[in-house]
Design a protein with these regions (language model features):
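N-terminal accessory scaffold of Fe(II)-dependent oxygenases
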Residues: 1-337, 341-370
Length: 370
């Protein structure tokens, strides 16, 4: 077993705490580092909708971007301290990388989005002509928890949540270039020969990286169990650049299998009662779990509290998933690939910060260039 789950640290410095939004979900340790899979294995796993870890694949370039990573960390810290982002972006080292192609047009604070910190709008220009409108970089908190400092910088364009971004690949790529200008360490993925060769073989075409997000997962933070399915995207390439994160990742049908299997265990009764004290809620989840289609639909709903309580707040279920071999610990230079073929087969995943300070990671959607 590569990752072991423990109920306490036992003062072992090799164990990482699983603490998120003040929920204590155990401790994990890595028995052995996984080996790098060969290209055939990567392709097979990808086609089978399995998460794939590529350990240390970017280790040879991390030092190359040390200055950029340090600058990005400073931007994150200043944002945490309540400083506005726009004035920083208009100064060096950002100004010379953005201008003249990406002039900053405005910065807003979206009142309708309580997690929004600041949203910056840009146009893309070439020879004085606008070639791409309404590009944006949005800084947001990952949760509403005051004790979770996790944040992200997301890059896209158009009306957030309404625009079919896959229908405009030109603006998608311009938003990707905007990411490069603000976070040059993005090149660790986009310009890495070995990684790009591997991904090209995996998807059967030249890879493109769109809908980019720069994450800073902080202690007591991370992401709850979710998927990242979006039309036109094949999956997600996640690269740990600093700090470390703990993961659980598996295809949705496998996750449903494990929910059903866990609820059949005698010990599930007491475990479930701790996260769903109401007996009617416990019975409702068990009833859902008896019908795969009903459980699958429930998981896709915005409000899926019954399954969320189990997947995100139940230490015994977290242990069950780690014991079953779905866990990963990512360190600087590691990459995790997660297929997102469709809503029925996509890899669901949950993330924990396992470092003492916020760590930076790159999360890029993968699409083909045919």
């Amino acid at each position: 077993m590569a990752i072991q789950w423990f109920s306490s640290s036992d003062n072992d410095p090799e164990r990482y705490e699983l603490l998120r939004r003040s929920f204590e979900l155990g401790w994990i340790a890595e028995d052995t580092r996984p080996s790098m899979p060969d290209a055939a294995t990567v392709k097979t796993k990808w086609n089978n909708d399995e998460a794939i870890m590529l350990p240390d694949i970017l280790a040879d370039v991390i030092d190359r971007y040390s200055t950029d990573l340090e600058q990005s960390h400073k931007l994150m810290e200043r944002t945490l301290n309540g400083e506005e982002i726009a004035p920083k972006i208009e100064a060096e080292p950002y100004a010379s990388r953005l201008n003249p192609k990406f002039p900053l047009l405005s910065a807003v604070f979206e009142e309708h989005d309580e997690q929004c910190i600041e949203k910056l709008f840009f146009d893309a220009e070439e020879n004085g002509e606008v070639i791409g409108e309404d590009l944006w970089c949005k800084a947001s908190w990952l949760s509403f928890d005051d004790n979770d400092a996790s944040m992200r910088f997301r890059f896209s364009f158009g009306m957030e949540g309404y625009e079919d971004v896959a229908a405009d690949p030109e603006r998608q790529m311009l938003a990707s270039e905007l990411t490069d200008a603000i976070f040059p360490e993005s090149a660790a993925i986009t310009e890495h020969p070995e990684l790009n060769k591997l991904l090209a073989e995996m998807v059967g075409a030249k890879p493109a990286y769109t809908e980019r997000i720069i994450y800073f997962n902080a202690p007591n933070g991370g992401a709850q169990m979710h998927h990242d399915v979006e039309r036109g995207h094949l999956g997600v390439v996640f690269a740990q650049m600093s700090g470390s994160t703990g993961w659980l990742a598996m295809a949705k049908p496998v996750l449903i299998d494990e929910i059903q299997a866990f609820l059949e265990l005698p010990e599930s009764e007491a475990a479930l009662a701790k996260v769903l004290p109401d007996i009617d809620s416990q019975n409702a989840l068990r009833e859902l779990a008896e019908d795969r289609a009903a459980l699958s639909c429930h998981m896709d709903e915005f409000d899926h509290e019954l399954s969320e309580a189990l997947m995100d707040r139940c230490p015994e279920f977290i242990k069950h998933l780690f014991d079953r071999g779905y866990g990963y610990i990512l360190k600087p230079g590691d990459v995790l690939l997660m297929p997102q073929r469709d809503l029925e087969t996509c890899v669901w995943h949950t993330v924990f910060c396992t470092s003492e300070d916020p760590g930076e990671a790159l999360s890029f959607a993968l699409r083909r260039i045919d």
